[in-house]
Amino acid sequence: MARDVDNKQNAKRISRDEDEDEFAGESMVGRTLDNPFLGEDEFEDIFGSESQYISSSGQNSTNPFLADTRIENSPLGSESKANQLNKQGTNVNHIEIPLRDFNDPTQPESFLPPPKNTFTSRIKKIKNLFKKEKKQVKPEDLGPRQIILNDYSANHFLHNAVSTCKYSAFTFLPKFLKEQFSKYANLFFLFTAVVQQIPGITPVNRYTTIGPMLIVLSVSGIKEIMEDIKRKKQDQELNESPCYVLQGTGFVEKQWKDVVVGDIVKIVSETFFPADLVLLSSSEPEGLCYIETANLDGETNLKIKQALPETAGLLKPVELGQLSGEVKSEQPNNNLYTFDATLKLLPSDRELPLSPDQLLLRGAQLRNTPWVYGIVVFTGHESKLMKNTTETPIKRTSVEKQVNSQILFLLCIFVFLCFASSLGALIHRSVYGSALSYVKYTSNRAGMFFKGLLTFWILYSNLVPISLFVTFELVRYIQAQLISSDLDMYNEETDTPAACRTSSLVEELGQVGYIFSDKTGTLTRNQMEFRQCTIAGVAYADVIPEDRQFTSEDLDSDMYIYDFDTLKENLKHSENASLIHQFLLVLSICHTVIPEYDESTNSIKYQASSPDEGALVKGAASIGYKFLARKPHLVTVSIFGKDESYELLHICEFNSTRKRMSIVFRCPDGKIRLYVKGADTVIMERLASDNPYLQTTIHHLEDYATVGLRTLCIAMREVPEDEYQRWSTVFETAASSLVDRAQKLMDAAEEIEKDLILLGATAIEDRLQDGVPDTISTLQTAGIKIWVLTGDRQETAINIGMSCKLIDEDMGLVIVNEETKEATAESVMAKLSSIYRNEATTGNVESMALVIDGVSLTYALDFSLERRFFELASLCRAVICCRVSPLQKALIVKMVKRNTGEVLLAIGDGANDVPMIQAAHVGVGISGMEGLQAVRSSDFSISQFCYLKKLLLVHGSWCYQRLSKLILYSFYKNIALYMTQFWYAFCNAFSGQVIFESWSISLYNVLFTVLPPVVIGIFDQFVSAGQLFQYPQLYQLGQRSEFFNLKRFWSWITNGFYHSLLLFLCSIAVFYYDGPNKDGLASGHWVWGTTLYAAILATVLGKAALISNHWTQYTVIATLGSFLLWIVFMPIYAVAAPAIGFSKEYYGIIPHLYGNLKFWASLLVLPTIALMRDFVWKYSSRMYYPEEYHYVQEIQKYNVTDYRPRIVGFHKAIRKIRQMQRMRKQRGYAFSQGEEDQSRILDAYDTTHTRGAYGEMR
């Protein structure tokens, strides 16, 4: 019953179609349905009746969610398929929606809600009139796919090679050019380069713009190609993975890319499926096999698949090679957990139905099964996993977007200057035209104005620094290499370095406000270990904390913990020895684990679909209760070397509603006993009135919960024979019922699960990745909000949240776990009201953590509730979303993206994390044990979560600060030089005359000032890495955009204007009374212009030195070296250029320049005057208005000892006291047993039989 309810609720999931252009900031966004099986009643449950939708004219309009949504239009095409989906059990109940966001071209537009009647929507409608509609072909319209067995020539389908590359040989140029010319600056330079080719317009050489622009585009293109080559290599590594394919009567090794539809492949344990397969047979009884789908849905427990009975006996390659027949399947689609197909084996005409029970998805891993045979049905990009991936998105950083917007404002100033200069030329002509008859002005004033406009456009075009973009890309690439070569983020154990796959996002790492993290494989190792237990009120552990070790001074205290050796002694001599025996017996026989003898190691290997059960069985075996063998109705266990067999009578299965599993055994002494394990809440409700160890056990459970251990309560009762016989009849009747069987079985279990005796509880550790608690704590201190999105259950998620310190003892838990939309809305609103009431009463908001499950999240993401849900989530320091599907992970990220302007980072290690990683501004992949799908789709990859701390706090902060300074400095230095052209226009009758020689203007950016921004962008450190770790609060400078914002940008622009005007006026003053030189000639225009050029160069290089925080030899080379380069270059160029006819402006200038005292005095005095204001400003701001990092710079400079370690002990003591006072209701229950048909597993295996010649279990 609960399972059916869960499926129905999850069938109502909806998704968003994000349109950032039209709907950004609006509360209503487009939606489409992720599940094709919704009827009209279900639509009304979610969206209300049709009458709620009113057209703009005031008339009732058709509900857009009901149009064209008949079952026959669904991807599967029949109502029976919806029913079949609900029969699959809860292994699909929370992941039935596909991974991809629903910008699905196959869905009718009528799914979308009515758009607002805005100007934007009208424009879009007009554009749509001129668009040529493409007819979209739906998969169901193509008919079934026909696959012929063992006839490769008859099957012509897509190859199995996959690619995650951004470009191909054909798409590189159009895609790259589209991306580059989406930047306003590049469009501006393109237009300028075109105008510059018009004869008689340009005042400078016609190639001074197009040349640098081609260099910029070339460098950017080379960088993109190199990064895409890396992606191609990773794709190649996957495509060349080995697998075994049937050829004739034997299997040969082939590469994944060579697998084709119709192949029969052999997959061995611990390997991934290379394509979507139909299971034919396996080494296990009745064609069973275990698969791990953590790479797909994040679930830690194993799933069970079963071959058809007609094919389960095909164990020999010869038999497989003789197969003839066909598979008719649905066309490739993105529905992961539905599959409709039939198998016909000749000579029979019977068509055998295939379902998801026989479907093995690409990306899943075979576990605890030696081998399986399967038929390939979908390959490559037609596999269901790849159908759910989207094209690698093109991401742009916040800084880049700000630069783009500020360039627009700068262009407005530029256009104003052009118009002002052109207008000035007309005014000057009107006033002085008659006195300047030799100029020969044209009579066409309008033509003169527009010609002047284009001339000044070219003359002032360098106000926007073209070199910025090539420098920007170059520095980004080098920063990416520094990240990839950081040995602190190198995992020696797995030989895995960090990798930057998208260098264009490095500065985004310094502004992250939210982190969305997967749990399994990212925060945890998914390795369960039996750590502690409490039996009859006594606590035991494998490792005992120092403050809890037993002393003889207080024998009766329940504060102490004993080791497992003491547990073994108490089995022999304690008065509670019988309870200890029964406790360990439950661990060793009450489970679905399959034992298998390993001849190579002469030991037993346990195959467990639940990692929790595996840990408990191994824990019991380590104490002396070793599980040996299983038959369909018999379990054998060795107790300290003595074998005992227990007859399994009935099993009451575990599910998420019952939260417990119970098995009825007939024990060797002839008595019937019921053994139960489950959550503390459900076990304690069913205890007998006399349980002396209840309170002590509760106290121990709370202790386990505070350290993040996963707990289960263990209980039992003896069942009288007559009671058992009566109950057995009730249970068998319920098991054979055709109507509401699940509820009747649960009711039957309730009748016998009563008057239990509490034996104790277990505590299992889900091992965290190294350094996870410290990393999370540090990142939270840095002001980053962390959301954990996991497919696991609520209890498991809370448990991990505690152990990894995402949830600490100071936090209150806000839990939203509802079944309907109305209940979810009420819960969210009630919790918001409570928080605001508390704030009004106490004056502050308590530190809280929000926990929400997948069903509630479906409704919380609805547009009517989204804002309120985000408001609640934003008030919480941490958020845990459990039982979420891959698509929901992406929708959560997009929801936060719509409601906040902060940078979002998503981190995960499985294919189920790919939508989330692609939806976030920054995607980080963990190169772990769940494959490399997440890594291939990510922007950065690391091998452990703990490396995220340095990636963000150090590399992120440095990259953001460095690139911000690089951008600001690049704009400043261009304005400082090129604005002098505008000031000079007032002195030359707005004629368009230039101050500087043409190629000197171009070389200013390309040669003489290129090194300072590069060196600053690569080597500058506003504080050291150690200080960034010690003071993670400094990371908030990036979150607040302190280093690059509107105020700071325009202060630099203003400073550039100031320096250009000051130096221009001072240079005029220096040469105003210029007398003749030794040769009797005046210095002239080019001497004055070159002196001004050198003074500006010295000033901007001095400015670079002034803003450098971290001096290296490269800083000296970039500043002093660049100026010395100009001093050496100038005489060589002035002699060589006129001699070869390249440029004649500098002919004969060197004697007048280098022999002129005014020139050398100007190089010393003018930059000093210009930079004096900057020096005074820097001194006063640091002394009287210091920022946070200024204090840290002083601490770093003078090596001041940090005072904070002195109070660490005090804080630890306070936390320990709070731990003792809190979490009295949360007792750490968590259990990852899959809700499979557990009886089927127990009935299928007889492990006393040996395996056959092909490894099959007979």
Curated annotation (Swiss-Prot):
Protein's membrane topology: Multi-pass membrane protein
Positions annotated to bind Mg(2+): D518, T520, D909, D913
Catalysed conversion reaction: ATP + H2O + phospholipidSide 1 = ADP + phosphate + phospholipidSide 2; a 1,2-diacyl-sn-glycero-3-phospho-L-serine(out) + ATP + H2O = a 1,2-diacyl-sn-glycero-3-phospho-L-serine(in) + ADP + phosphate + H(+); a 1,2-diacyl-sn-glycero-3-phosphoethanolamine(out) + ATP + H2O = a 1,2-diacyl-sn-glycero-3-phosphoethanolamine(in) + ADP + phosphate + H(+)
Record EC number: 7.6.2.1
InterPro entries named among the record's database cross-references: ATPase_P-typ_cyto_dom_N, ATPase_P-typ_P_site, ATPase_P-typ_TM_dom_sf, ATPase_P-typ_transduc_dom_A_sf, HAD-like_sf, HAD_sf, P-type_ATPase_IV, P-type_ATPase_N
Cytoplasmic compartment spans: 1-183, 230-406, 473-974, 1020-1051, 1108-1115, 1170-1258
Sites marked Involved in the release of the transported lipid into the cytosolic leaflet: I466
Region (Disordered): 1-41, 53-83
UniProt cross-references to Gene3D superfamilies, sorted A to Z: Calcium-transporting ATPase, cytoplasmic domain N, Calcium-transporting ATPase, cytoplasmic transduction domain A, HAD superfamily/HAD-like
Record keywords: ATP-binding, Endoplasmic reticulum, Golgi apparatus, Lipid-binding, Magnesium, Membrane, Metal-binding, Nucleotide-binding, Phosphoprotein, Translocase, Transmembrane, Transmembrane helix
Lumenal side, ranges: 205-208, 428-451, 996-998, 1073-1086, 1137-1148
Entry annotated with the keyword Flavoprotein: no
Pfam families found in the cross-reference section: Cation_ATPase (PF13246), Hydrolase (PF00702), PhoLip_ATPase_C (PF16212), PhoLip_ATPase_N (PF16209)
UniProt-annotated binding residues for a 1,2-diacyl-sn-glycero-3-phospho-(1D-myo-inositol 4-phosphate): K1103, R1173, W1177, K1178, Y1189, H1190
Active site feature: D518
GO process terms (BP): endocytic recycling; phospholipid translocation; post-Golgi vesicle-mediated transport
GO CC annotations, alphabetized: endoplasmic reticulum; endoplasmic reticulum membrane; plasma membrane; trans-Golgi network
Entry cofactors: Mg(2+)
Parts of the chain that traverse the membrane: 184-204, 209-229, 407-427, 452-472, 975-995, 999-1019, 1052-1072, 1087-1107, 1116-1136, 1149-1169
Location(s), subcellular: Endoplasmic reticulum membrane; Golgi apparatus, trans-Golgi network membrane
Biased composition (Polar residues): 53-64
Residues at which ATP binds: 518-520, 613, 654, 656, 659, 677, 710-711, 790-792, 883, 889, 912-913
Signal peptide span: none
Role according to the record: Catalytic component of a P4-ATPase flippase complex which catalyzes the hydrolysis of ATP coupled to the transport of phosphatidylserine and small amounts of ethanolamine from the lumen to the cytosolic leaflet of the trans-Golgi network and ensures the maintenance of asymmetric distribution of phospholipids.
Similarity comment: Belongs to the cation transport ATPase (P-type) (TC 3.A.3) family. Type IV subfamily.
Name used for this protein in its record: Phospholipid-transporting ATPase C887.12
Organism from which the protein derives: Schizosaccharomyces pombe (strain 972 / ATCC 24843) (Fission yeast)
Lineage per the UniProt record: Eukaryota, Fungi, Dikarya, Ascomycota, Taphrinomycotina
